[in-house]
């Protein structure tokens, strides 16, 4: 007779194998896009620009994680790179949400903090987050590069960005796992390019 731990062991194996499968499919379909995103980030930093990142829920946490890798470091000892997660200042978030509605929570910050030559990275597993799409519109209007991290076919986000990583899955957890893996790969390419020249 199987014990509860046996069924959990099988479940753990299935979940990790599912994550590996989505990563494998991402490699097959998105590797050139990942390189293109990394090259655009390098270009942004070389020209004196900064990254602004946004997302909701788990994607907000990913925005903060990615910003931390650039500002602190990823693997190499080097000077910090300018990256700001637009998800962290509760006074700003609540003021904008209260005065303008939540849909404008990131767009208003992009308008205030962004400059031509900067890049805005919007993270939305569904590709239909109104607040992220509004931020991308504000970025384009302000002369900034735009990158989306999303899932499946990209939702409507894909229509509002210059480059879009579309993880081939509809499972939110799997998409988020790939997003942070890709972000680490992008950080590695940026560090190798800017600090090993």
UniProtKB/Swiss-Prot annotation:
Substrate binds at residues 56-58, 69, 98-99, 124-126, 129, 176. It is found in: Cytoplasm. This is Phosphoheptose isomerase. Its cofactor is Zn(2+). Its main location: cytoplasm. Residues 41-197 form the SIS domain. Pathway: Carbohydrate biosynthesis; D-glycero-D-manno-heptose 7-phosphate biosynthesis; D-glycero-alpha-D-manno-heptose 7-phosphate and D-glycero-beta-D-manno-heptose 7-phosphate from sedoheptulose 7-phosphate: step 1/1. Its EC number is 5.3.1.28. One of its GO terms (biological process) is D-glycero-D-manno-heptose 7-phosphate biosynthetic process. It holds the Pfam family SIS_2. GO terms for molecular function: carbohydrate derivative binding; D-sedoheptulose 7-phosphate isomerase activity; zinc ion binding. Zn(2+) binds at residues 65, 69, 176, 184. Catalyzes the isomerization of sedoheptulose 7-phosphate in D-glycero-D-manno-heptose 7-phosphate. Keywords: Carbohydrate metabolism, Cytoplasm, Isomerase, Metal-binding, Zinc. Belongs to the SIS family. GmhA subfamily. GO terms for cellular component: cytoplasm. It is an enzyme of class 5 (isomerase). The gene is gmhA. InterPro entries: GmhA/DiaA, Phosphoheptose_Isoase, SIS_dom, SIS_dom_sf, SIS_GmhA/DiaA_subfam. It comes from Roseiflexus sp. (strain RS-1). The reaction produces a racemic mixture of D-glycero-alpha-D-manno-heptose 7-phosphate and D-glycero-beta-D-manno-heptose 7-phosphate. It catalyses: 2 D-sedoheptulose 7-phosphate = D-glycero-alpha-D-manno-heptose 7-phosphate + D-glycero-beta-D-manno-heptose 7-phosphate.
């Amino acid at each position: 007779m199987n014990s509860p731990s046996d069924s959990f062991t099988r479940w753990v194996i299935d979940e990790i194998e599912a994550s590996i499968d989505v990563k494998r499919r991402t490699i097959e379909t998105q590797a050139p896009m990942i390189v293109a995103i990394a090259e655009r980030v390098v270009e942004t930093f070389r020209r004196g620009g900064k990254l602004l990142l946004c997302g909701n829920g788990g994607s907000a946490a990913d925005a903060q994680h990615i910003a931390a890798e650039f500002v602190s470091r990823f693997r190499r000892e080097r000077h910090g790179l300018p990256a700001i997660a637009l998800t962290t200042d509760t006074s700003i978030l609540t003021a904008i949400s209260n005065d303008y509605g939540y849909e404008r929570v990131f767009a208003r910050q992009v308008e205030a903090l962004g400059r031509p030559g900067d890049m805005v990275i919007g993270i939305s597993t569904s590709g239909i987050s109104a607040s992220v799409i509004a931020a991308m519109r504000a970025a384009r209007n302000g002369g900034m590069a735009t990158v989306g991290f999303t899932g499946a076919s990209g939702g409507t986000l894909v229509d509002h960005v210059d480059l879009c990583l579309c993880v081939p899955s509809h499972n939110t957890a799997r998409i988020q796992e790939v997003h942070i893996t890709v972000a680490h790969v992008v950080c590695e390419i940026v560090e190798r390019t800017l600090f090993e020249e």
